[in-house]
């Protein structure tokens, strides 16, 4: 008897289209924009918001350029999670045996920003809301792509904020914050963002 597919397996299947996330980055971004999520127990094969966010995190590295001196060529390319981890095994499954320009992709869970300098992408969890300003201040102008679902994340200096719109996971971008850290976001990524802030934080709040 065939076993019921686990959620982490579902995000790779043709049934959901998430397999595009591993082989066709541009197609994956377009697909992720169209995926609706459901809370019904009958929709087991449909990715959850966290599954979709994990797929975005996995694909962001294909649309962002880091400074050449931001890490050793032989060091792993680290996607880090600070605080509450809502991804379970979804992110681990997506990056298994994957590389970025010859560097092995790894997932790291952090309890503070003290070791975040070794990360290339940092997802800041909900549990960090009260420490958000401090967390982002510690990473200011460092080549770490910061991502979160926290409210007002971009206003605090974060770079990419996930949003839920009409049961779909979308994202907004704070371009100056990324540029000040030496990161270059591709035009393909910016085109599919809900909004792109092009003003530095001090100007945007005037």
Predicted segments with their positions:
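Short hydrophobic alpha-helices and adjacent helix-cap/hinge residues
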Residues: 2-6, 17-28, 36-206
